[in-house]
Every structure is written in structure tokens, then in C-alpha cells.
């Protein structure tokens, strides 16, 4: 694979496992065979998740440059910032996290939302958590630049890790490795996955998978489900990162488009719709697999809808990419009242 030439610092247990979600498949009429690639349990660092795979290719740069602080940014319940806090602890670096107000949470619930879930874990791991009132944007942020400047002015050497690692030059490399794993695991399992379904917001996960699968001429197997609700921006950023990553790994393919299903991101980033809640419950009740209301709940909602619509050919093997995110669930407790037995 073209990613082999890049330095990598191991943060995961190795290739993430693939589970057969056979009860979910049966529940949906046995039309297709659903499998999940479990990025949600890929590491012993603070519950793991997809960002660690990206960070593995960024750490060599951090270690080499002798940086003092890791600085990252996300919403209040960002998984990215939790992972950067864990990484900082692992590397013995200080950590500053900018947690912006990306999600319109009702005032009555804001206090809980700002204290539990991912943000709580980051605080436990010793990060300097800065809660800022700016709204959602997948691009580069003023608050982020300010934090970096402040640390530099104080004589420190901060390392910037942008939202979702996406604007980092190596942000897409981790999921090239993911694509290589899928190809190897197909051989081990004796099956071929017809389609790969993945959540998309800041773009580098999907971009890495696209570039990685393009090594095997299978980039069209990827179906991304938008959870940003700013899908044009997400598509543009994903294509840019995919093309940049393809160049890095020596793949002669120019991405001009990819499948991005935009039907499930409403009402906005970070707020589940009724279908999202239903999908989270369905997956949990059928499989004991937990998905979150921000990312995976929406991609699971998309997967279930596509199966019900007969989007996939009968008997298809569909690989759902579980990117993590469950630590945010406690911040959304009001969406999940007790069901009577």
C-alpha cells in the first residue's frame, strides 16, 4: 500500500475487528448481510475511535518537533478533542482544547451537556478545556488561532490538530490503512463487501477510505452519510482531502464526486431527528451495539433506510463503518426515556 512509506506511531490494538450484525440483518428482512468494522473498540486509549487512526500518522511529526502542547478544537461533545486529550496524556504533553458551541441544545439541558460525556473525559485526562460560544463550522477557526497564538506568546511550542484532523496534511492517511485492512479481512473472512457505509462531517475519514479503495479500483463501493447538515462544504472538503491523500500515496485518480447521502443530517449537526433515535435504539436492541446521536446514529439511520429502500442488491454484503462516538451518549439522555417491558 502507498501508505507504508509514512511514519506511524501505534495507538490502536492493530486492525479493527469486523462483527457480523446478523440480528440487525434479520430484523431488516434478511435482504442484505450487514457487517460492522469496529473503530469504536480499536484502542485502550479513552474508549478509542476513528480519530486515533488519523493521529497515528500525525504523532511522528509531534515527537520529532519537540512540541510542548497539543491544541485541538471541536464541539462540546467532540470525540476528536477527547482523543487528543488521551494522546497528550500518552505522550506526556500538555493539552488545550477549544470546545465550541456547535449544537443548539435547549437552555435547560445545556449545563449537563457541557459537563458529561466526552468533555468530562477530557477534563479527567488533564486537558485545559476552554468552552467557547462560537457556532458550528468544519473549517479553520479564529478561536483555534487565538489559542495557538496565546501559547506561542507565553514561550510554548504548540502543535495544532484541526477539527477531525481533517485539515492536517496527513489527515487522510489513517483511513487509507483502513481500506487496506478491509481488503485483507475480505480474504480472511472469505467474503467481498459490496458497499461500505460511513459517516461524513469534516471529511478526512471518508477521504482516506476513498483514496485507499482507489488503490484497488473500488472507490465507488463507498457510500458516505452526511451528518454535518452543511453538505456542500463537507463534499468539497472531502474531495479536496481525497485528492491530496491520493497524491501522497501515489494513486493516479482524481476524485470529482462521490456518493454523499444528505437526507439524515437534519435538523442540524449534533441534534438527532426521530429517525436517528429510532436507528440508535434498533441497533442497540438488536445487537447490543451503541451508536451516538451526532455521527453514527445518523449513518446507522442512513444504512437502515437504504436497506429498506432496496438500494443494495439482494444478498449484498454491506460493511458499516462504526467510527466510535458512544461516549457522547450521556449528554443526550433526555432523548432516551425508559421503554416499558
Curated annotation (Swiss-Prot):
**What Gene3D superfamilies is this protein classified in?**
3.40.50.1100
Q: Needs which cofactor?
A: pyridoxal 5'-phosphate
Q: Does the keyword Plastid apply?
A: no
Molecular function, one GO term: pyridoxal phosphate binding
The PTM N-acetylserine maps to: 1
The record's CDD domains line, in alphabetical order, gives: ACCD
The record's active-site residues are 78
Task: Specify the superkingdom.
Answer: Eukaryota
Disulfide pattern? none
Top EC class of this enzyme: hydrolase
- Biological process (GO) annotations? amine catabolic process
Q: Which reaction does it catalyse?
A: 1-aminocyclopropane-1-carboxylate + H2O = 2-oxobutanoate + NH4(+)
- In its keyword annotation, does this UniProt entry include Cell division? no
Q: Which residues are annotated with the PTM N6-(pyridoxal phosphate)lysine?
A: 51
Entry EC no(s): 3.5.99.7
Report the protein's function. Catalyzes a cyclopropane ring-opening reaction, the irreversible conversion of 1-aminocyclopropane-1-carboxylate (ACC) to ammonia and alpha-ketobutyrate.
Protein name as it appears in the record: 1-aminocyclopropane-1-carboxylate deaminase
